[in-house]
Amino acid sequence: LGDVYKRQVVNYLKYTLNITGHQLDEILNKKSGLLGVSGVSSDKRDVEAAAAAGNPRAQLASDMLNYQIKKTIGSYIAAMGGVDAIVFTGGIGEHDADSRAKICHHMDWLGIRVDTDKNANAHKQNKDVVEITAWGAKVRTLVIETNEELMIARDTKEVPVSYTHLTLPTN
């Protein structure tokens, strides 16, 4: 949906269901998405486990998320006029080889192709950056380890701090 339609849907739901903004936020951000479709969880790992056990709603939720990620990648590639690399990071990006494969499937025409063995074994490499690009692909595909603690430390270091408002004890 376009942004205009999203606002209309939000307003329609709020007034039709006669709920507060807080209640609508709870529905849209906590009870929808993976949880709403799968009926299992908002955690992709739980959804994947349920899908592997044969839960069709969990499989649908996983497929929908992978499709949405693929669609987003495609829209960014179009907006930027091409890319040099696709980077997978974070929980799903780093640890879910199956999702990476499904997301990149049928993207050869964009120059994106993943090596099946490299992708399946990316987590075993013990490297910060693992390339999973298939031979001959024009766009590099990388799995990059997330170091959230380091990023928080770097961001915190950049925050200007003023101590003029502090009164320190003089014991």
Q: What residue spans do the PLM features occupy?
A:
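Internal helix-turn-beta structural module
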Residues: 59, 63-79, 93-162
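A conserved active-site cap/scaffold subdomain adjacent to cofactor or substrate pockets
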Residues: 3-26
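Buried hydrophobic packing segments
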Residues: 9-13, 47, 73, 153-156
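Flexible, glycine/charged-enriched surface loops at secondary-structure junctions
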Residues: 21-25, 37-42, 76-84, 114-120
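Glycine-rich beta-alpha junction loops
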Residues: 3, 32, 92
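Conserved small/polar residues in nucleotide/adenosyl-binding loops
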Residues: 1-8, 164-169
